Regions:
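C-terminal boundary and immediately downstream tail of ABC-type ATPase nucleotide-binding domains
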Residues: 221-242
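ABC family nucleotide-binding domain
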Residues: 1-4, 8-220
Length: 242
């Protein structure tokens, strides 16, 4: 489904990604973790072409992301993306946020789009908030709306870039619960996160990054029980000590 081969990226003279290779199979959940500044968010943004890369190749459902002939907007319409800061339109209601891209990008009728939107709001526990504006919702609720908006496009895969890092601690679980349900329904997911409990619960594999490199790419149980690299051992000892 998602394949990265020898991907490298520079910001001018600074190399932020160094020869990164991994893949995510259909229906697989892969968590990408590592210390701040390790290249995690940059890597996931390269997957749908939000960030260009200079070497290597990335393909999603056999479509080459870096090929100049590739219609990136069309590809992005098939890949759901959930960001750290929600990125909802503040001047539109919750329902209008869900309807807009369905109508403009997919060409769906408004009635069908609203029906799909309401079904997804119910799925994330926010049906009664359809007529509200994002500013009237908590951070956790806004992030759940963002997930519903991404799902409204019927994506073949979902990318999450630290979806809980901007939330108050007590709101994190309501977002993770939605993501766990998505994973158990078979959604292909690539998730950048520090939520190791989520990783243990639903990830099939964990990719650990440090200084722009993929240091480990291992089945979840193996990563947590017997990390191969010293760097991953240090990271886990710090993040799991409490």
């Amino acid at each position: 489904m998602i394949t990265l081969e020898h991907v490298s990226k520079w910001y001018q003279s600074f190399q932020v990604l160094k020869d990164c290779s991994t893949e995510v199979a259909k229906g697989e959940v892969v968590v990408v973790c590592g210390p701040s500044g390790s290249g995690k968010s940059t890597l996931i943004k390269c997957v749908n072409g939000l960030e260009p890369f200079q070497e290597g190749s990335i393909s999603v459902a056999d479509v080459a992301v870096g090929d100049r002939k590739t219609d990136l907007p069309k590809l992005r319409a098939r890949i759901g993306m959930v960001f750290q800061h929600f990125e909802l339109f503040p001047h539109l209601t919750v329902m209008a946020n869900l309807v807009l891209a369905q109508v403009k990008v997919l060409g769906r009728g408004r009635a069908e789009s609203e029906q799909r939107g309401m079904k997804l709001l119910e799925r994330v526990g926010l049906r009664e908030h359809a007529a509200k504006f994002p500013g009237q919702l908590s951070g956790g609720q806004q992030q759940r709306v963002a997930i519903a908006r991404a799902l409204a496009m019927d994506p073949i895969a979902m990318l999450f870039d630290e979806p809980t890092s901007a939330l108050d601690p007590e709101m994190i679980n309501e977002v993770l619960d939605v993501m766990v349900a998505l994973a158990r329904d078979g959604m292909t997911m690539m998730v950048v996160t520090h939520e190791m409990g989520f990783a243990r619960k639903v990830a099939h594999r964990v990719v650990f990054m440090d200084e722009g490199r993929i240091v480990e790419d291992a089945p979840t149980a193996e990563f947590f029980q017997k990390p191969r690299s010293d760097r991953a051992q240090i990271f886990l000892s710090k993040i799991l000590q409490h």
